[in-house]
């Protein structure tokens, strides 16, 4: 009996590879037939797909699309594909059949039809890092609810009364700690990141800059960010794995803040404070704990990362355009003189609204630097546009950078020219071709705060410092925009009596 069982086992082991091969062949054949049937059905429904190429199996053309390139260009991949196929072409990116759009009209059409023909669809790895309740990945009613909370917290009234003074206070805290010895050399990108992180940590959770807990959170956040832009390989030691660990640590800090407030409320029989977003979300919404945690983490990411890079880009572009710096300084000197005549030492909302050329500089920085390069969307209904058929189920990437750098829309698009926005002579801001914060129902909720941060920081920067690059550096896309060397600058303090420093403001 034992010999018979051994013989059967031996025969099974002998045939096992053939059985597995047969099963694998059956599986791959079935999958291939399903794909062929689906593509045949798509071609029947959508016979006029955009031109393009699929690239390698599984990976498609993803590596080429994400190849590092200067932030002030669309990169070699996009340039070659646009030249070969036009501004609308098909590809295979991030594991999906994809239509890539460098067409201004189609990009507007996509953003205007959010929830009708298209919906937000980021790679799963992004949701794994930011959380399933992150505003970046939510769609439909959950997204609208989260966005409404953010918009209410960032209302115009709050911008004027609370956030403007907070932005100025944090600006002065950063600039006062710049080395007093002149000239001094340091990373402008690091300083911009420190400024925006401390500002967001204060307004999200009332965490003060310089505190040990705040600094620990900032270091955890740096590790977290490295995972956001890494390959989603969840193995010990990988950037993604470390980011998930940092995410858990950051959420633990937020959760402890929530518990402390609930205990304080129960102990003192008082309501939850609303001085920050955490208190606002706990009192003004019916969100669960998990939803609040993901909301705060995603806003820390969105409010810190993009704003800090935009500010670093402004410092970089201005360094190469002395004429713009001079006009900027003249505008802010006039604002400072009016402050002194009023007997005031802090910026008012009226001062901010008078920063007209500053807004031109901000617009041009966002156009040329393109902090947000493209958006992830999915087609939810068959779309017919400019003679092309785009099937439902496909991904579509509206490339905002390609529109901002389009020579048919902007004269000499690779040149930093803030005067193109002055008086809006070209009408570009109202044309729908300028979309640095997205558009439609998913327009960035913090766009006004981001512009306020840049304007206030530039006000105090140009009044008190001159700067130049300490060594050559340039913004690259990796796929997020970053300065390889951290944008090292050499800074000189301004000491003229007429341009008296305002860093002595009592804060």
UniProtKB/Swiss-Prot annotation:
Primary residence: membrane
GO biological process: brassinosteroid biosynthetic process; brassinosteroid homeostasis; jasmonic acid mediated signaling pathway; leaf shaping; response to brassinosteroid; unidimensional cell growth
Any GO CC annotation of this UniProt entry: membrane
S-S bonds: none
A Pfam family the protein falls into: p450
E.C. number: 1.14.14.178
Subcellular location: Membrane
Gene Ontology molecular function, alphabetical: heme binding; iron ion binding; monooxygenase activity; oxidoreductase activity, acting on paired donors, with incorporation or reduction of molecular oxygen
Top-level EC class as recorded in UniProt: oxidoreductase
Reaction equations catalysed: a C27-steroid + reduced [NADPH--hemoprotein reductase] + O2 = a (22S)-22-hydroxy C27-steroid + oxidized [NADPH--hemoprotein reductase] + H2O + H(+); a C28-steroid + reduced [NADPH--hemoprotein reductase] + O2 = a (22S)-22-hydroxy C28-steroid + oxidized [NADPH--hemoprotein reductase] + H2O + H(+); campesterol + reduced [NADPH--hemoprotein reductase] + O2 = (22S)-22-hydroxycampesterol + oxidized [NADPH--hemoprotein reductase] + H2O + H(+); campestanol + reduced [NADPH--hemoprotein reductase] + O2 = 6-deoxycathasterone + oxidized [NADPH--hemoprotein reductase] + H2O + H(+)
Transmembrane spans: 12-32
Cofactor(s) demanded: heme
Keyword set, alphabetical order: Heme, Iron, Membrane, Metal-binding, Monooxygenase, Oxidoreductase, Transmembrane, Transmembrane helix
InterPro entries: Cyt_P450, Cyt_P450_E_grp-I, Cyt_P450_sf
Binding site for heme: 444
Pathway noted in the entry: Plant hormone biosynthesis; brassinosteroid biosynthesis
Membrane topology classification: Single-pass membrane protein
Keyword Transport listed: no
General function of this protein: Involved in reduction steps of the biosynthesis of plant campesterol-derivative steroids, ending to castasterone (CS) but missing brassinolide (BL). Catalyzes the conversion of campesterol (CR) to (22S)-22-hydroxycampesterol (22-OHCR, 22-hydroxyCR) and of campestanol (CN) to 6-deoxycathasterone (6-deoxoCT).
Family: Belongs to the cytochrome P450 family.
Protein name: Steroid (22S)-hydroxylase
Recorded name of the encoding gene: CYP90B1
